[in-house]
């Protein structure tokens, strides 16, 4: 039972954080989508949906294309282009680094 309370408090904390920072939620959403990690993508989208702001999160994912040094763009296309230019290993290293920098792991694990 204690575990359920800790998880619930963690989700509430993440939702409060998400409310304050849709750019981060959007970036995490895009990073997970680019890597094909749909379970974590759904977790991020679930938080946005629970807050009634899923569309804003999707828009933020596209606005957060600065991860690849671009103002706007499709995450999957950007990831593929980066992998073509620098190699798949480097692209994945950068994607994982960005996931860590944004604290995406906590959002993905919360649901």
Predicted regions and their residues:
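Sec-dependent signal peptide recognition
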Residues: 1-8
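Hydrophobic h-region of N-terminal signal peptides that target proteins for export
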Residues: 9-18
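Generic hydrophobic secondary-structure packing signal
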Residues: 14, 24-25, 44
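Immediate post-signal-peptide N-terminus of mature secreted/exported proteins
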Residues: 19-38
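Compact alpha-helical subdomains of small soluble proteins
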Residues: 45-111
């Amino acid at each position: 039972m204690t575990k359920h309370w800790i998880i619930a408090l963690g989700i509430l904390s993440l939702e409060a954080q998400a409310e304050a920072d849709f750019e981060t939620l959007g970036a995490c959403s895009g990073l997970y989508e680019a890597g094909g990690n749909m379970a974590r993508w759904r977790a991020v989208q679930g938080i946005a949906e629970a807050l009634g702001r899923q569309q804003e999160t999707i828009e933020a994912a596209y606005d957060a294309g600065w991860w690849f040094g671009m103002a706007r763009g499709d995450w999957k296309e950007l990831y593929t282009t980066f992998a073509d230019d620098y190699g798949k290993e480097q692209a994945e290293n950068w994607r994982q680094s960005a996931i860590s920098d944004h604290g995406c792991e906590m959002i993905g694990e919360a649901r």
